[in-house]
A protein has these predicted regions:
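C-terminal substrate-binding subdomain of Rossmann-fold SDR/epimerase-dehydratase oxidoreductases
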Residues: 16, 197-327
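Residue-level signal for the nucleotide or nucleotide-sugar donor/cofactor binding architecture
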Residues: 36, 58, 87, 95-98, ...
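Catalytic helix-loop patch of NAD(P)-dependent Rossmann-fold dehydrogenases
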Residues: 87-102, 113-114, 123-173, 178, ...
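NAD(P)H-binding glycine-rich loop region in Rossmannoid oxidoreductase-like domains
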Residues: 57-94
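Hydrophobic alpha-helix immediately C-terminal to the catalytic Tyr-X-X-X-Lys motif of short-chain
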Residues: 154, 158, 162, 192, ...
């Protein structure tokens, strides 16, 4: 495989690059470094099979040129700051929806025939399922709760349209839960750790702490993506597109995840809740995905939530530079 990875210097992207190189593939990375970190690619940069290109997904011509000769594109570049969406409403449209369109046009120009798109479980908004049932891939999309999720719905539609029109032989859409692990750089686990490193006696939680989330370790995420793409099921799918939920078979509320984080720190802070029931516009009160489809192919996660959260805390404690890099 000769792979092109957008968002290659980011959290998930850099882990994917390392895994692709470990499996012997050639990789071209693409990132504008708006949130990505060069340090995440230190190991990859020593490989003769890796080339990194600084560029933006809004620069379609440059991206098409860099993509030449690649057969598979992993599109992970995106603005993932859900909370900040309404402060900069054009960002999700430009980086996520228009960025995905540009990637697809670059794919068409470069002649790549296989694409994997990183979407999100947030596309399900507030799914019309019972209070504890996981959401399957065929659940209808309700009213969207964030600009980020809306932009990912647009991206999914573009990917499937290009595949249906014959511009892709295989398209894969992966709806992730929240991802944790080495090189993690945003999300409430990151925020809680930053607070506790500054003051272990107080922890401010946005929302009432009852929001229920599911988490997946980044190594399980990368393995799931490569496992599904490697099977090639989209080649025989009715519309050349396969959609997979990626997550664990469990969830945890924010208050309990705060407990795991505090235990890893050896801290017992005073908890303070702010922002009402949810904490910010766009926060989903319940994300729990039905992963039976991808599990039926032979993939399953190795890390539980109780393992992934402390592992992430340990990495952040060992790499405090990342907090300054993301400030």
């Amino acid at each position: 495989m000769k792979a092109f990875v957008t968002g290659a210097a980011g959290f998930i992207g850099s882990n994917l690059v390392d895994r692709l190189l470990a499996e012997g593939h050639e990789v071209i990375g693409w990132d504008n470094y708006s949130t990505g970190q060069e340090r995440f690619l230190e190991a990859a940069s020593r490989s003769p099979r890796f080339r990194m290109v600084r560029g933006d997904v809004l620069d379609r011509a440059a991206m098409s040129k860099a993509m030449a000769g690649c057969d598979t594109v992993f599109h992970l570049a995106a603005n993932a700051d859900i909370r900040d969406g309404w402060a900069h409403p054009a960002r999700d449209l430009e980086q996520n929806a228009l960025g995905t369109f540009n990637v697809l046009e670059a794919v068409r120009a470069a002649g790549a025939r296989r694409l994997a798109f990183a979407s999100t479980g947030s596309v399900y908004g507030e799914p019309a399922v019972s209070a504890s049932a996981p959401t399957p891939e065929n659940a209808p999309f309700p009213t969207q709760t964030s600009l980020y999720a809306a932009s990912k719905v647009a991206g999914e539609g573009l990917v499937s349209a290009y595949a249906e029109a014959g511009h892709l032989d295989e398209a894969y859409v992966f709806r992730f839960v929240s991802i944790l692990g080495d090189r993690y750089t945003h999300g409430h686990v990151f925020d809680f750790c930053r607070q506790l490193m500054h003051d272990s006696g107080r922890l401010r939680i946005l929302g009432d702490g009852r929001q229920r989330k599911s988490y997946l370790h980044v190594q399980d995420c990368v393995e799931g993506v490569l496992h599904a793409v490697g099977r090639g099921a989209a080649r025989s799918a009715p519309h050349r597109t396969e959609v997979y939920n990626l997550g664990t078979d469990e969830f945890i509320d924010v208050r309990a995840s705060a407990g795991l984080i505090c235990a890893a720190f050896g801290a017992n802070p005073r908890l303070e809740f702010a922002g009402g029931e949810r904490g910010w516009v766009g926060d989903s009160p319940f994300i729990f995905l039905d992963t039976r489809k991808v599990r039926a192919t032979g993939w399953s996660p190795r890390f539980s939530i109780a393992e992934a959260v402390p592992a992430t805390v340990r990495w952040l404690q060992a790499n405090p530079w990342v907090f300054a890099a993301r400030s």
